């Protein structure tokens, strides 16, 4: 889990992981609403360049409609077969973890330490670290999501 929420930060994190991970590197990432729309396609392009598999999802859409954020992000798609757009962030994390194999790494980027998501004026509890831990524990116990 990393706070990488710019193209440069995402590039640094993914480049480092590609150097040290023996398997595939996947990334779950999103772009915040009411922020620089220009960085959205760049984050997608960086993800597609440096990760083997990508899941684009929500990351504090705030007052923006998530589909508009996704439309901006889609402008950076270079290989549609290696990226899925999943509105539900928990589901995106779940899919990334389910698709990982021993030796692989899943980077969950963008929110880092933040324990919430912002949807309009509503703040919803959501912590990537806790969600990933819960899902990994279910996997360890043989549970289904």
Located regions from the model:
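ATP-dependent carboxylate-amine ligase
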Residues: 1-145
């Amino acid at each position: 889990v990393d706070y990488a929420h710019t193209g440069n930060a995402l590039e640094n994190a993914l480049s480092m992981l590609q150097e040290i991970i023996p398997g595939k590197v996947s990334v779950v990432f999103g772009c915040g609403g009411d922020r620089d729309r220009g960085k959205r396609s760049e984050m997608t392009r960086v993800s597609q360049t440096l990760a083997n598999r990508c899941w684009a999802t929500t990351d504090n859409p705030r007052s923006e409609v998530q589909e508009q954020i996704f439309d901006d992000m889609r402008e950076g798609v270079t290989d549609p077969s290696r990226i899925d757009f999943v509105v539900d962030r928990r589901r995106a994390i779940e899919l990334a973890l389910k698709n990982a194999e021993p030796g692989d790494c899943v980077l969950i980027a963008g929110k880092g330490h933040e324990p919430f998501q912002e949807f309009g004026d509503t703040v919803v509890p959501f912590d990537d670290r806790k969600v990933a831990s819960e899902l990994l524990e279910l996997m360890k116990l043989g549970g289904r999501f």
